[in-house]
Amino acid sequence: MSVNGPIDASLLRIVRDRTGAPETAICRAYESDASFRAACADVRICFRAQRRWEAADSSRAPALAAEYAELLEDLAEELRRILKPEP
């Protein structure tokens, strides 16, 4: 285990579901790569915000939930790039 510690189960599930990457690859990257950890932190924040807007009773809620969904996909793509660097 590194000084940063392992990824928690809820974040692991979110990242796995968004990237399709194996849990072992996600755990390794989380423990060894600061940019991956930072992107994971952004994913967690974005995921929570999207869920809040999906549950919100506001005329703006659907548009904001959609914006967060799009941002979440962009972040997932960033995580996939980190997990599978170009040859």
Model-derived segments and spans:
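Extended, charge-rich alpha-helical interface modules
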Residues: 1-87
